[in-house]
């Protein structure tokens, strides 16, 4: 049960790392992202596809670039992460020692 959550968090972390690279270095291509992150090309490509489906990046002839929606998403991200952390904290089962 927890394994699936961990895998989702790892994948989200990768997607956000790819997004951060696009924001900082746009336009940027798959090969450069793969070389800098150590992620295989197919994983970078998948993250780019997910980010494109969310309208956070778009392809260009020079590589991935941000969209108008990217800034709004980034501004809301920290708040959403904090909400998730609070929810996870409330799920802990305390045991007596």
Residue ranges and their predicted role:
Residues 1-18:
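Short alpha-helical segments that sit at the start of domains
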Residues 20-24:
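Short, locally clustered residues in the helix-turn-helix/winged-helix DNA-binding domain
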Residues 25-29:
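Short capping segments at the starts of secondary-structure elements
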Residues 32-35:
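A short acidic, leucine-rich amphipathic alpha-helix
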Residues 52-62:
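A short, conserved structural fragment
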Residues 62-80:
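Basic, amphipathic "hinge/linker" alpha-helix immediately C-terminal to the N-terminal HTH DNA-binding motif
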Residues 75-97:
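Amphipathic alpha-helical dimerization/coiled-coil segments
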């Amino acid at each position: 049960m927890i394994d699936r959550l961990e895998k989702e968090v790892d994948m989200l972390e990768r997607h956000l790392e790819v997004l951060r690279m696009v924001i900082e270095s746009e336009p940027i291509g798959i090969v450069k992202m793969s070389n800098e992150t150590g992620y295989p090309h197919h994983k970078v490509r998948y993250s780019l596809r997910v980010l494109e489906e969310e309208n956070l990046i778009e392809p260009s002839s020079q590589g991935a670039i941000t969209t108008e929606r990217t800034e709004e998403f980034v501004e809301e991200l920290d708040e959403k992460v904090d909400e998730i952390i609070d929810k996870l904290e409330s799920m802990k089962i305390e045991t007596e020692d």
